[in-house]
Amino acid sequence: MNRIIFCTFLQKKSEGQDYPPYPGKLGEKIYNQISKIAWKEWKLQQTKLINEEKLNMFNQNDRKKIEKYMKLFLFNNE
């Protein structure tokens, strides 16, 4: 059975994640508030950002930058 949540990104009920897609408290927040559809939209945006800004995910500062973008994209900087 699919888990239905109220997605804060889409502002409607939608199918939730199967598991937290990110570690820690932020991952739990995403699991509880962000739908599969919204997460897929973020993954597309993330790929664009990594390519356009030439971010290196082995670099800690670049990972922090992409996390900041993720929070802004998904939660509109709550």
Curated annotation (Swiss-Prot):
Monomer. It comes from Buchnera aphidicola subsp. Schizaphis graminum (strain Sg). One of its GO terms (biological process) is cellular response to oxidative stress. GO terms for cellular component: cytosol. HAMAP family: Fe_traffic_YggX. The lineage of its organism: Bacteria, Pseudomonadati, Pseudomonadota, Gammaproteobacteria, Enterobacterales. InterPro entries: Fe_traffick_prot_YggX, Fe_traffick_prot_YggX_sf. Could be a mediator in iron transactions between iron acquisition and iron-requiring processes, such as synthesis and/or repair of Fe-S clusters in biosynthetic enzymes. Belongs to the Fe(2+)-trafficking protein family. It holds the Pfam family Iron_traffic. The keyword Iron applies. GO terms for molecular function: iron ion binding. Keywords: Iron. This is Probable Fe(2+)-trafficking protein.
